[in-house]
Regions:
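Catalytic alpha-helical scaffold of carbohydrate-active enzymes acting on polysaccharides/glycoconjugates
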Residues: 1-119, 124-184, 203-299
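Surface-exposed cleft-lining segments at the edges of enzyme active sites
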Residues: 188-198
Length: 299
């Protein structure tokens, strides 16, 4: 029986990425034309075509302005997660700043979704050994898992020496790393995002197949709504930032659809987290179906 992988979406607008930070400071976000609703709904339609439920990690800023988008995702059966409020890398924050940002985002997202949020993903995969205190704060705020580890070599984020497999950070919190393919002594980033846009499709497919077949476990993939938006406005940023943001946007949707046809996908909670902590593999009611917000030990 094919392994079900985890598909996740970091819901942010095109002007909210680190690559666009120089041209779109946070205090100017409201002045940019938003594409996040249309792009996210395009993903809703694509996932519905293949009967796929994914995890949508919402930016709190987006959830506060477009609460209906959050509730739509929930009503469609997708898991709702938290992607911070202001999209500031955690290693640029103090513990107090991180707590305030994350708490605000979680509250806004839960109010819009009507269910408690179990999962967190840091902007730019920015929880690493230098900010180990962040895990304790996540647990205190009621999160059950973090998916902020991307164990690859990268100029800005990641730790190529980090764990590739999910692991418990504490009794109440698990870390669920993004998919990497261990080959020739290196961790090859096959977990999506810019890597899916830029790398040959066969390489991503081979890496995910190897994780499923050789390691007998699911991989976690991610993308952003703006990555399927070839028509997004081009902002005046550096050459390297343009390359990070705009390279092969035209290929992303076709590559994503090929993955959806060739692999099975589900939410991060049900395909990766639950098997780690619950042998019965049954989700709590608050995550299995749309339900009023309940702050219980299960959620």
């Amino acid at each position: 029986m094919p392994i079900t992988n985890a598909l996740s979406v970091d819901v942010e607008d095109y002007f909210q990425t680190e690559a666009m930070a120089a041209a779109a400071p946070r205090n100017s976000w409201g002045s940019f034309p938003s594409h996040v609703e249309a792009n996210t709904r395009s993903l809703f339609e694509l996932f519905a075509k293949y009967d796929i439920r994914a995890t949508f990690f919402f930016l709190g800023w987006v959830a506060e302005r477009y609460p209906r988008l959050v509730s739509e995702a929930r009503q469609l059966g997708h898991e709702i997660g938290c992607h911070s409020y202001w999209h500031r890398p955690v290693f640029h924050l103090s513990p107090t700043e991180f707590r305030e940002d994350t708490s605000r985002a979680k509250q806004v997202i839960e109010d819009a979704a009507g269910v408690a949020v179990a999962g967190y993903r840091a902007p730019c995969f920015s929880i690493n050994s230098s900010v180990g205190w962040a895990h304790g704060i996540l647990e205190e705020l009621g999160f059950q898992y973090d998916s902020s580890s991307n164990p690859v070599r990268h100029a800005f984020y990641g730790d190529h020496r980090g764990h590739r497999r999910p692991f418990p950070v504490s009794e109440g919190l698990h870390e669920l790393p993004i998919a990497t393919w261990r080959i020739l002594g290196q961790n090859l980033p096959v977990g999506g995002g810019a890597y899916l846009r830029i790398m040959p499709y066969w390489l991503v497919k081979s890496g995910l197949s190897s994780i499923n077949r050789t390691e007998s476990r699911p991989g976690i993939l991610y993308l952003h709504p703006w990555e399927i938006d070839e028509a997004q406005p081009r902002l005046e940023v550096s050459l390297i930032s343009r390359a990070r943001q705009y390279t092969r946007l035209s290929q992303m949707k076709e590559k994503l659809e090929r993955l959806l046809r060739q692999f099975k996908f589900g939410t991060v909670y049900e395909t990766v987290y639950l098997p780690l902590v619950n042998k019965n593999n049954r989700a709590p009611d608050c995550l299995a179906t749309p339900a009023p917000l309940r702050r219980s030990s299960a959620c």
